[in-house]
Structure formats: structure tokens, C-alpha cells
Swiss-Prot record:
It is an enzyme of class 6 (ligase). The gene is purC. CDD domains: SAICAR_synt_PurC (cd01415). This is Phosphoribosylaminoimidazole-succinocarboxamide synthase. Its EC number is 6.3.2.6. Pathway: Purine metabolism; IMP biosynthesis via de novo pathway; 5-amino-1-(5-phospho-D-ribosyl)imidazole-4-carboxamide from 5-amino-1-(5-phospho-D-ribosyl)imidazole-4-carboxylate: step 1/2. GO terms for molecular function: ATP binding; phosphoribosylaminoimidazolesuccinocarboxamide synthase activity.
Length: 239
């Protein structure tokens, strides 16, 4: 399928979305922009768009092999990918295998505390509101999703967790937590957006070194080098 990039549909914090001549498909452009704190801090980090695009393509293909439908169609270039056009559900699904980030702040937990079984949370995707936590009841009452869609999203999120925990563990890494976004394509719930170190927490199993966007949030340095290390350790082809 050879589709050409047309009008800019949407520019997010780190990706731009373009129309194609086929209304069922879009082109995502992964930019070098890196943001934190709901877009309050934005910087350019060289190679980031390429690294995240390749990382995401690898993960999406692994998930497809496990029977999880995603919007990924094919990688077009170093920083662009062809995807199905989804009707996005404005709710982020977050799984936590270990305590970190906002959960530590909210409940006073020790960072790195194992969570068994993993926790599952929903957040309304709205930067202006700070992506507040919501629940299934609110999501249904406000018309964001049906109970059946929410149940499928939860099922798929835990399936993703099972697949990726094993993948990262084999690379000597801890998948601490991650967020997913879903949409509807031809009446099916499909995984959308991206999976990269921008949207998850990944630590070295032995040293607990952070290898994700917390390096940017916490000004730890070596952000892209850490992304590339994770990619290398799980087998992402970077050339």
C-alpha cells in the first residue's frame, strides 16, 4: 500500500499526524520534540524521532504476533509510519507492575515496590486538566466508551503487559509501568498511539537505573542513549 502524506491533521507534543488519500489510513511523523509535565517543558533531542519510530514498530509487530490488533501497518521511513485511522477513545489505560511516579506521590509508597497483581488505572486524556484519574463509570456516563469497549481495553492492556514483561525481562529489564491508548476501527477495539520509552518506565533489573523518559523529567541526562540501550537489549533493529 503506497499512500502519500497529505494535509496535517493534528500536531501533538511529539508526533504529527497526516491525512492520506485513503480515509482509513494516516501517517504518523515521530519528531525529535521531547515534552514533560503535560507540555510545560519541551526540548529537541537529536535522533529521538527515529529511535521511537523504530522502537514502536518493533513493539507493535511483537504485539501483533501475540494476537493483539494494533493500528500499525508499516514503517515508511526512519521517522514515519503508516497506521489505521482510529476513532480514539479519550482514556489512557495504565498498568503498574512496580510503584513509581504519581502512584508513589499519591499513596506514599516506596518507589520500586512490587505490585502483585499489577494495578490498572484509567486517566482522562486532557493536558489542560492534567490527565485526571477517572473510572469505568465516569467513562460510560460521559460517553467516552461503552462498558464492552472498556472491558476489551482492560483485557488487551493486561495481555500487552504479559507479552512485554517477558520481552523486557529477557533483556535484563523491569517494565515498571506503561500507558496505552485505544480506538475503534470498523467496530473493533484496536491499540493505537505508540509504545516507546516516552510512555513507559523501564529500569535495569540489577542496578534499577532508569532508562526511560524519567531521565528527561528528572534531568538525569543521556536520554536518547538510554532509549537506544533499551532498544538494543530487547532486539530492536536500529539500522
Amino acid at each position: 500500500m503506497q499512500l502519500q502524506k497529505q494535509d496535517l491533521l493534528y500536531k501533538g507534543k511529539a508526533k504529527s499526524v497526516y491525512e492520506t488519500e485513503n480515509s482509513d489510513y494516516l501517517i504518523l511523523h515521530f519528531r525529535d520534540d521531547t515534552s514533560a509535565f503535560n507540555g510545560e517543558r519541551i526540548e529537541q533531542l537529536g535522533r529521538k524521532g527515529q529511535v521511537n519510530n523504530r522502537f514502536n514498530a518493533f513493539i507493535m509487530q511483537k504485539l501483533a504476533e501475540a494476537g493483539i490488533e494494533t493500528h500499525f501497518e508499516k514503517q515508511l521511513s526512519d521517522d514515519e509510519v503508516l497506521v489505521k485511522r482510529l476513532e480514539m477513545i479519550p482514556v489512557e489505560c495504565v498498568v503498574r507492575n512496580f510503584a513509581a511516579g504519581s502512584l508513589v506521590r499519591r499513596l506514599g509508597l516506596e518507589e520500586g515496590q512490587p505490585l502483585t497483581p499489577p494495578t490498572y488505572e484509567l486517566f482522562f486524556k486532557d493536558d489542560a486538566l492534567g490527565d485526571p484519574m477517572v473510572n469505568e463509570s465516569l467513562s460510560v456516563s460521559l460517553g467516552w466508551a461503552t462498558p464492552e469497549q472498556l472491558a476489551k481495553m482492560k483485557e488487551l492492556t493486561f495481555k500487552v503487559n504479559d507479552v512485554l514483561k517477558e520481552l523486557f525481562d529477557a533483556g535484563g529489564l523491569m517494565l515498571v509501568d506503561f500507558k496505552l491508548e485505544f480506538g475503534v476501527f470498523q467496530d473493533r477495539i484496536v491499540l493505537g498511539d505508540e509504545f516507546s520509552p516516552d510512555g513507559c518506565r523501564i529500569w535495569d533489573k540489577e542496578t534499577k537505573k532508569k532508562l526511560d523518559k524519567d531521565r528527561f523529567r528528572q534531568s538525569l541526562g543521556d536520554v536518547i542513549e538510554s532509549y537506544e540501550e533499551v532498544a538494543q537489549r530487547i532486539g530492536v533493529p536500529m539500522n
